[in-house]
Amino acid sequence: MMVIPVSFKFKTMDDIEVTGKTVLVRVDINSPVDPNDGTILDDTRMRLHAETIRELSDRGARTVVMAHQSRPGKNDFTTLEQHARALSGILRRPVKYVEDIFGSAARENISGLGDGEIILLENVRFYSEEVLKRDPEEQAETHLVRKLAPLLDYFINDAFAAAHRSQPSLVGFALRVPSAAGRVMERELRTLQGALENVERPCVYVLGGVKVDDSIMVMKNVLENGSADLVLTTGLVANIFLAGCGVKIGKVNMDFIKSRGYCDFIKVAKKLKKRFPERIVVPVDVAVCRDGKRVDVPVKKIPNHPIQDIGMETIKLYARRIREARTLFANGPAGVFENPDFSIGTEDILNAISSSEGFSIIGGGHLAAAAVKMGFEDSINHISSGGGASISLLAGEELPAVRVLEESRHP
């Protein structure tokens, strides 16, 4: 499937002249970090955003990089000093770390930038207002935006993975400074919107993992608007639908659903399955952990043991439906893929997706990590860098960071 070009209502980097201009670029380089010494364990996101940063530098922009790492209270909530070093290595040019966000040191470093030079400001979430969720208009009035905006010629948002959040660094600058989308943001929106607007049939969604609220939100939207022909359920999502269908899934599995606060979704699942009986597919068997080993059982005979994967018969059924699809969206693993005994469902579904002739998209998060780990990265059309943002898009929700790019005024 060829994705038909999407026309954007916002500017991209192709539309602006950045030579000699001061450009603030918001990226999402939030990375796994060793809590003991702050060492970055995976630089995937930095390599992704390096494309945008390198292009700005090559075009002679005075580049100010803004990013976050984790959130307050987490053990990986660190400075961005290591990130600056890692970016310098990836870009093969200096990236100066500035231990300030919008104070005098930050402003002096911004004002002193030369053409092509790059600085990385401190973790923007060290600033308390950054973690408040408010309307973009309010975020444009924060100290962060009011202090830095006068020093900037352009704001570029490349943080697609955080585009569903309405925080000052993501939505505030676009209302005060001429703005554009970075290359990651542009590519993600072009692919996802293009696939959503030009669906080839049949269109199959594979929804699993443990974020049940996200999956049900997406499912409801794509079934009601008719864009999905079939939804295959896996993971905890499948367990909740099985319970909604009256299947006795065992006390240990019901207790897990309760522990996640998902009991109310059993009723929601029951109603959805009743409305779309042929279009929502649930497993016919599951794999449980019994005495530390994988045991496949029919759903009518689930013992009181943790469900860890979909069963082999379900895998065969799902793989056939996936291979028939012309458009595929998948989110969330089928089971506890970190355990080799229970990685079969996730791996076989990814294998079916990668060998399908349909256009395939994976919505970030754990399934994306599994796809890379299992070697399917190059055979899937698009692996999104933004789990939450891609889910919001598939659920028909507005992305605040994209809306303000559309509203940004240019001279």
Swiss-Prot record:
The keyword Glycoprotein does not apply. It is an enzyme of class 2 (transferase). Substrate binds at D28, I29, N30, R45, H68, Q69, S70, R71, R125, R165. ATP binds at E338, G364, G365, H366, L367. One of its GO terms (biological process) is glycolytic process. GO terms for molecular function: ADP binding; ATP binding; phosphoglycerate kinase activity. It is found in: Cytoplasm. It catalyses: (2R)-3-phosphoglycerate + ATP = (2R)-3-phospho-glyceroyl phosphate + ADP. Homodimer. This is Phosphoglycerate kinase. Pathway: Carbohydrate degradation; glycolysis; pyruvate from D-glyceraldehyde 3-phosphate: step 2/5. Its main location: cytoplasm. Belongs to the phosphoglycerate kinase family. Pfam families: PGK. Signal peptide: none annotated. Keywords: ATP-binding, Cytoplasm, Glycolysis, Kinase, Nucleotide-binding, Transferase. GO terms for cellular component: cytosol. SUPFAM superfamilies: Phosphoglycerate kinase. InterPro entries: Phosphoglycerate_kinase, Phosphoglycerate_kinase_CS, Phosphoglycerate_kinase_N, Phosphoglycerate_kinase_sf. It comes from Methanothermobacter thermautotrophicus (strain ATCC 29096 / DSM 1053 / JCM 10044 / NBRC 100330 / Delta H) (Methanobacterium thermoautotrophicum). Its EC number is 2.7.2.3. The keyword ATP-binding applies.
